[in-house]
């Protein structure tokens, strides 16, 4: 396992970040984030990492060189806008936190209503939350056709949660993500569109 990834996970843990936020920051699954925070020190001590089974296999994506630049992000948003040329919709919902910058740029480029969905994994409370909430301009999308935007889809859980929530107040038509790690094409009847998709090829010697 990449040493840099382990060190980043441990640093975020020591800063008080919960597993959900670590997963979001490093573009890994919550399961992998939890594994790294609990076992990171031992993994660093090991001379070589043990062979992982398929259930523990995850892919680390880093696109800091893009998301750190508003100009580069705008170029990505323009690609998504081009993919939206045949989709009729009224609003853009960005999934917090990674999807918000792109959703903002897309809504500005196409002059659409903008809103934010905050998933339950980002709500830190003693009581267990069953869902997230619309964090901005909910009234602007009620009863409207909307698209959902996120940066990376790992397991699809946050996207599924967002779709279920929005179906109660609006009509989600499509989901757009920059990078898809899940291989999922549809959730709750809503199609998933991606710019890039990762996969694992098992090559047996």
UniProtKB/Swiss-Prot annotation:
<dbReference type="InterPro" id="IPR029057">
    <property type="entry name" value="PRTase-like"/>
</dbReference>
<keyword id="KW-0805">Transcription regulation</keyword>
<dbReference type="GO" id="GO:0006222">
    <property type="term" value="P:UMP biosynthetic process"/>
</dbReference>
<keyword id="KW-0238">DNA-binding</keyword>
<dbReference type="GO" id="GO:0004588">
    <property type="term" value="F:orotate phosphoribosyltransferase activity"/>
</dbReference>
<keyword id="KW-0804">Transcription</keyword>
<dbReference type="InterPro" id="IPR022854">
    <property type="entry name" value="GfcR-like"/>
</dbReference>
<comment type="similarity">
    <text>Belongs to the purine/pyrimidine phosphoribosyltransferase family. GfcR subfamily.</text>
</comment>
<dbReference type="GO" id="GO:0010468">
    <property type="term" value="P:regulation of gene expression"/>
</dbReference>
<dbReference type="Pfam" id="PF00156">
    <property type="entry name" value="Pribosyltran"/>
</dbReference>
<protein>
    <recommendedName>
        <fullName>Transcriptional regulator GfcR</fullName>
    </recommendedName>
</protein>
<dbReference type="InterPro" id="IPR000836">
    <property type="entry name" value="PRibTrfase_dom"/>
</dbReference>
<dbReference type="GO" id="GO:0019856">
    <property type="term" value="P:pyrimidine nucleobase biosynthetic process"/>
</dbReference>
<dbReference type="GO" id="GO:0003677">
    <property type="term" value="F:DNA binding"/>
</dbReference>
């Amino acid at each position: 396992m990449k040493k840099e990834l382990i060190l980043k996970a441990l640093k975020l843990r020591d800063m008080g970040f919960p597993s959900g936020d670590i997963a979001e920051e490093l573009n890994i699954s919550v399961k992998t984030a939890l594994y790294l925070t609990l076992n990171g020190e031992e993994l660093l001590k090991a001379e070589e990492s043990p062979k992982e089974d398929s259930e523990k296999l995850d892919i680390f994506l880093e696109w800091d060189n893009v998301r750190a630049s508003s100009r580069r992000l705008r170029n990505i948003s323009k690609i998504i806008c081009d993919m939206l040329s045949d989709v009729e919709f009224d609003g853009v919902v960005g999934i917090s936190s990674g999807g918000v910058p792109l959703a903002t740029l897309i809504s500005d480029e196409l002059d659409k209503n903008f809103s934010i969905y905050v998933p339950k994994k980002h709500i830190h409370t003693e009581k267990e939350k069953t869902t997230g909430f619309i964090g901005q301009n909910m009234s602007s999308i009620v009863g409207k056709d909307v698209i959902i935007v996120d940066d990376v889809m790992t397991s699809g859980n946050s996207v599924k949660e967002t779709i279920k929530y929005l179906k109660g107040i609006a009509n989600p038509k499509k989901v757009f993500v920059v990078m898809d790690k899940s291989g999922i094409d549809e959730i709750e009847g809503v199609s998933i569109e991606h710019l890039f998709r990762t996969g694992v090829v098992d090559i047996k010697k």
